[in-house]
Amino acid sequence: MKNNIINLAQDLIRRPSISPADQGCQQVIAERLAQLGFTLEWLPFGDTLNLWAKHGSGSPVVAFAGHTDVVPVGDETQWTYPPFEARIVDNMLYGRGAADMKGSLSALVVAAEEFVKANPNHTGTVALLITSDEEAAAKDGTVKVVETLMARGEPIHYCVVGEPSSGKVLGDVIKNGRRGSITGELYIEGVQGHVAYPHLAENPVHTSLNFLTELTTYQWDNGNEFFPPTSLQIANIKAGTGSNNVIPGELYVQFNLRYCTEVTDEIIKNKVAEMLAKHQLKHRISWNLSGQPFLAGNGELVKATVQAVENVTKITPRLDTSGGTSDGRFIALMGAEVVEFGPLNATIHKVNECVSVEDLGKCGEVYYHILERLLKS
């Protein structure tokens, strides 16, 4: 299995699929799956290519999800090995996307292939959801596929997302949920004027200080068994013209909350509105909800994944919900139990991104064992 995974990973890495470009990656995968009797459905939206592939029928539907797009390489001269050469050095596979996530995507594909070969009459459905729009806008990828499936009443019961979840060693972390993410774009209005005549102006920076203190120190919740407390961070703040003699007429504040299941986006919006009213600030605000929090808890997929990781790596993984958002947030909206498991994330989005060849082989074994537990005939 390992050699097949590495060969496929190298083929995919050599295709410079900067998001949302796919550069033929999904076609390579589709041709392999078609030979094994998978039904293929292409779901293009905008400039994004999506593939929905299935083998078998009925329940449960166990889906593997991944993406073929990668982030830009940056200054290519800083790379020790060319980012799209897919070179193996000292048992490490180097290249953009090696860890995030062409390596684990290859492991997902090969695991599905091997399972179907060994169990042609398996119960339920093996599915793969592959997109080229995860790293950039995430507007025409998994979210659109999920909308399509939901519109026709087609379920996903369990989903393994192959994101690089591991920290220090393969298998030390399984993501069994993710926090929600919401961003506020706030404009506090004042009156512009000369700094020598403050009585003729209103400085929005000064009038907002008490509000900003309350906003940044407010305790939203205490977290729970699975999530840390909700956190808020100011990401950007701007006022003034750049001149030292002009009182600004407007203050711009952009802030983001990573929130747990103890609060909702509506609770957050209402509380911020309450604070703004309390401090009598003339303002306008807009919100961008990137994703709701989701949690798989200790369900069947979590149990199957933990058991598979223990069998393959001989270590007991820690269940964790920290970190950024992933496409799992969209799939969870279907009522699916979602976990993320994949290789080490130490080099993702970095120069000299790389992944252990041995770890990719073990990832494939873990994915295979998950299918065995949930679908074996």
Swiss-Prot record:
Record keyword Hydrolase present: yes
Pfam family name, one: Peptidase_M20
Pathway: Amino-acid biosynthesis; L-lysine biosynthesis via DAP pathway; LL-2,6-diaminopimelate from (S)-tetrahydrodipicolinate (succinylase route): step 3/3
Residues at the active site: 69, 134 (proton acceptor)
InterPro entries linked to this entry: ArgE/DapE_CS (IPR001261), Bact_exopeptidase_dim_dom (IPR036264), DapE_proteobac (IPR005941), Peptidase_M20 (IPR002933), Peptidase_M20_dimer (IPR011650), Peptidase_M20A (IPR050072)
Residues bound to Zn(2+) 1: 67, 100, 163
Tree of life domain: Bacteria
One Gene Ontology biological process: diaminopimelate biosynthetic process
Recorded catalytic activity of this chain's protein: N-succinyl-(2S,6S)-2,6-diaminopimelate + H2O = (2S,6S)-2,6-diaminopimelate + succinate
Binding site residues for Zn(2+) 2: 100, 135, 349
GO molecular function: acetylornithine deacetylase activity; cobalt ion binding; succinyl-diaminopimelate desuccinylase activity; zinc ion binding
CDD domains: M20_DapE_proteobac
Cofactor: Zn(2+); Co(2+)
The record's free-text note on cofactor binding: Binds 2 Zn(2+) or Co(2+) ions per subunit.
Keywords: Amino-acid biosynthesis, Cobalt, Diaminopimelate biosynthesis, Hydrolase, Lysine biosynthesis, Metal-binding, Zinc
Documented EC number(s): 3.5.1.18
Subunit structure: Homodimer.
Family: Belongs to the peptidase M20A family. DapE subfamily.
PANTHER family reported for this sequence: ACETYLORNITHINE DEACETYLASE, N-ACETYL-L-CITRULLINE DEACETYLASE
Task performed by this protein: Catalyzes the hydrolysis of N-succinyl-L,L-diaminopimelic acid (SDAP), forming succinate and LL-2,6-diaminopimelate (DAP), an intermediate involved in the bacterial biosynthesis of lysine and meso-diaminopimelic acid, an essential component of bacterial cell walls.
Entry protein name: Succinyl-diaminopimelate desuccinylase
Species in which this protein is naturally found: Actinobacillus pleuropneumoniae serotype 3 (strain JL03)
Gene name of this polypeptide: dapE
